[in-house]
């Protein structure tokens, strides 16, 4: 979705925008929406459950014009009916144009695969919002729009961005979200303005734990469970007090059910975050998201990008750079973001790096389940580091604020990482 919290137009997203999809094909053709007099009223937040066709070409013999076909897509999906009674509202295009001053350039926040994002104010709600407008020539389209609306209309969690409403009018497709004043995690890690204070260790662990809880909700709490498939720094938005929320659910898929272990699908996602097993086989699992989360956790710890083309070839891929260093704890201090200036707890660093190493294991069966990741990161986030304490430094005795009893309460994954310290 890009940055919700920026206040001026910027070209800083050009690199991120280019890597929205892997091996993605823009499908054309004349397939129309499958319609039936009797529809299953059960809404599922996945492209599996929404049979949406690409646009029909207006020049096709007997075809339907693009504007008409887009309207038919929504009607055939009963989109408005499916979100009735949910928290999402429907808006007219005129309402959203007025909210953004007719999409003025000074309201522009950012741009992603879906389209441009604008800041606006919905007068009748007296609420500042972020409005994402579908680029009809972009890499994402009606399918992703529908999946996003269905997913967020069904979801309700403090670590998922709130969908306020949508517009499906003529050929216009827009999504209206709560406004996230601190922008994206990417803004604070990789495009930090000169003079702006970098995220401290405690805030980084807070963001990691919150993002993990959002992922846990998708995997373990939603019915049916959902595979996110697009977890990355630019999709983690930050609210007041840096409360993290996952955003951009257009690529989400319903997870495997019963005795199935995976969902076979086209490979889509972002290079650098995509699990190698999924990229090679097209077999999507919940562990695919765990890999992506491990990359994000590495970014939080190191301050490096998932893919950085300014580095030497062998160091461009963050996971490829980190794997040899995971093998020896003595390398761990070399991996820390220099912007932290040594202000981090050594034990907390070891544990966080070991968790990320487990998440980015080559073999998906070796990666932890999300509930274990949440337990471990909740523990690290609650173990506050005080840089002003006499015993606080990146030396031998890092200072944690916690009860003595916490030693017995440490989750299994944290204890395991202390023993191993590497993958």
Swiss-Prot record:
Palmitoylation at Cys-3 and Cys-6 are required for plasma membrane location. It catalyses: L-seryl-[protein] + ATP = O-phospho-L-seryl-[protein] + ADP + H(+); L-threonyl-[protein] + ATP = O-phospho-L-threonyl-[protein] + ADP + H(+). A lipid is attached at residue 3 (S-palmitoyl cysteine). The active site is at residue 230. The keyword Kinase applies. Keywords: ATP-binding, Cell membrane, Kinase, Lipoprotein, Membrane, Myristate, Nucleotide-binding, Palmitate, Phosphoprotein, Plant defense, Serine/threonine-protein kinase, Transferase. Its EC number is 2.7.11.1. The modification Phosphothreonine is found at residues 92, 265, 270. InterPro entries: Kinase-like_dom_sf (IPR011009), Prot_kinase_dom (IPR000719), Protein_kinase_ATP_BS (IPR017441), Ser/Thr_kinase_AS (IPR008271). ATP binds at residues 109-117, 132. GO terms for molecular function: ATP binding; protein serine kinase activity; protein serine/threonine kinase activity. GO terms for biological process: defense response. One of its GO terms (cellular component) is plasma membrane. Residues 12-22, 400-423 have a biased composition (Basic and acidic residues). Residues 43-52 have a biased composition (Polar residues). Residues 383-398 have a biased composition (Low complexity). The modification Phosphoserine is found at residues 234, 264. Its main location: membrane. The modification Phosphotyrosine is found at residues 177, 278. It holds the Pfam family Pkinase. It is a lipid-anchor. May be involved in plant defense signaling. Belongs to the protein kinase superfamily. Ser/Thr protein kinase family. This is Probable serine/threonine-protein kinase PBL5. It comes from Arabidopsis thaliana (Mouse-ear cress). The gene is PBL5.
């Amino acid at each position: 979705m890009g940055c919700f919290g920026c206040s001026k137009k910027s070209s800083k997203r050009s690199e991120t925008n280019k890597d929205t999809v892997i091996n993605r094909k823009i499908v054309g053709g004349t397939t129309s929406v499958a319609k039936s007099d009797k529809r299953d009223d059960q809404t599922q937040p996945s492209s599996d459950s929404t049979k949406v066709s690409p646009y029909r070409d207006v020049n096709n013999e007997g075809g339907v014009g693009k504007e008409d076909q887009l309207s038919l897509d929504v009607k055939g999906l009963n989109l408005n009916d499916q979100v009735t009674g949910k928290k999402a509202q429907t808006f007219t295009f005129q309402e959203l144009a007025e909210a953004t001053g007719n999409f003025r350039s000074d309201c522009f926040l950012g741009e992603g695969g879906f389209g441009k994002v604008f800041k606006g104010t919905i007068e009748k709600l007296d609420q500042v919002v972020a409005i994402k407008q579908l680029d009809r020539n972009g890499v994402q389209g009606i399918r992703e729009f529908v999946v996003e609306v269905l997913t967020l209309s069904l979801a309700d969690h403090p670590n998922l961005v709130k969908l306020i409403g949508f517009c499906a009018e003529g050929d216009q497709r827009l999504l209206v979200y709560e406004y996230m004043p601190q922008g994206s995690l990417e803004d604070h890690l990789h495009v930090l303005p000169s003079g702006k204070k970098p995220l401290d260790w405690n805030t980084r662990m807070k963001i990691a734990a919150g993002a993990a809880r959002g992922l846990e909700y998708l995997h373990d709490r939603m019915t049916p469970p959902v595979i996110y498939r697009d977890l990355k720094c630019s999709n983690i938005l930050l609210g007041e007090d840096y409360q993290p929320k996952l955003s951009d659910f257009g690529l989400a898929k319903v997870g495997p059910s019963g005795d199935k272990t995976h969902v076979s699908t086209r490979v889509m996602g972002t290079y650098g975050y995509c699990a190698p097993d999924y990229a090679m086989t097209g077999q999507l699992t919940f562990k695919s998201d765990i890999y992506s989360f491990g990359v994000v956790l590495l970014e939080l710890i190191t301050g490096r990008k998932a893919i950085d083309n300014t580095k030497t070839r062998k160091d461009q891929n963050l996971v490829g750079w980190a794997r040899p260093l995971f093998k020896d704890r003595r390398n761990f201090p070399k991996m820390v973001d220099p912007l932290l200036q040594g202000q981090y707890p050594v034990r907390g660093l070891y544990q966080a790096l070991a968790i990320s190493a487990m998440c980015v294991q080559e073999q998906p069966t070796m990666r932890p389940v999300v509930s274990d990741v949440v337990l471990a990161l909740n523990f690290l986030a609650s173990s506050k580091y005080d840089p002003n304490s006499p015993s606080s430094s990146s030396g031998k005795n890092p200072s944690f604020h916690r009860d003595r009893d916490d030693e017995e309460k440490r989750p299994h994954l944290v204890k395991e990482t202390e023993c191993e310290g590497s993958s």
